[in-house]
Amino acid sequence: MTAISDPDLALRDAQKAIQSGDFATARQITDALLAGEPTHKEALYMAAVCARYEGRSADALAHLDALKSLSPDFGRAYQEEGHLKRKLGDLSGAVGAFERATRYNPALMASWSALADLYHQAGNTDAATNARAQADRVRALPRELQAVTNHIHEGRVFRAEEIARAFLQKHPTHVEGMRLLADIGSRLGVQEDAEFLLESAVDLDPDNVQLRLDYIQVLRKRQKFAAALEQAGVLMARDPDNPLFQSHFAIESMQAGDYETALDHFERVLQKIPGDPATLVSRGHALKTYGRTEEAISSYKAATDVAPGQGDAWYGLANLKTYTFGDDELARMQAQFAALDIDHMSRVHIAFALGKAHEDRGDHDAAFLAYAQGNALKHQTVRYTTDQMHAEFDAQKAICTADLFEAQAGKGCPAPDPIFILGLPRAG
């Protein structure tokens, strides 16, 4: 098979072939690409699309399994899985796939629209209405911001930043553009800029709930807990009975050290949504920090009872350090770790909890295997590269020379006080 000299050009040709219905040509291109680079994500994705249209369901599933293994948070892989399962009549599986697709990439209009149809068929009117509203929201975005959202959630953050900045130069007060650029800044660790953008956007559109939720998150990341709690209070004043707002108010109260208020509001959420696993886990965290360990254990275990795949609940139990898993719990965690439809981060959390369970039993080989699996799974979602870090170090060495510092002699603060650098967990 002839090697592909320009993979990007070949992918564009494959995409054009798919769009024109020439799946044979598209298949030839993707086969050639994968022969030279079996882990090429876009080639695997297009190969799966071709296989679905050509009726080669087993091949499509194989390509998607490989793609999800390489990139567990690649939303389009789950969207394609949803299309395939829907075609095969597995409507429940299709719903699960489309739900994961929108979780990993909320810009996928096709997934939202498919969910709206499938929810409607199942008689779930509220969920159908929400999914349709989400599809309409994405559709209404300027095309540039649709692209920004897609780039963000497929890991191309710098490309997303370029488009967002260019858009805001033309539309400087577009609050969704400001929100997306703040999201990019937060992902890149530039929290101060993100805070300024969101504060400005909230001033422009104070009734925009998503803006304020993002603002709260950035304030928390900057450890401005009182300010985050104040913003959560604004949402609570707007709709005191809204469980989403109650949950955020509880979380910010916990961060601010007011555990009684936090626990009270977690209970209010659970009264409206009994057995909500995320709230049970959050309540467990609050109880643990408050020193009420036995109640924390009960809350975590309640979460695993209603949602056995809730990985952070199992991890919460393990992270207590003093909790010992029973044999039945070990078996349940092993079953969930092997389940096909579990979220990726839940699988990561369960792997580490399994490591703790095996370690407590003295089965060190099994413990090391579980820890290794957890680290390998986590590594799949980490886009860190040593090349990037080396480039940053080289740039610092090139710019920050002895001459640079000598030229700045005499500047700075003359105070002799020692400087303590805080906020570096495990730095020692």
State the predicted function of each range.
Residues 7, 23, 41-42, 75-79, ...:
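Helix-start (N-cap) detector for alpha-helical repeat units in TPR-like alpha-solenoids
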Residues 19-20, 53, 87, 121, ...:
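Register position in tetratricopeptide repeats
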Residues 23, 57, 91, 125, ...:
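TPR-repeat structural position
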Residues 36, 53, 69-70, 104, ...:
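Structural marker of alpha-solenoid helical repeat scaffolds
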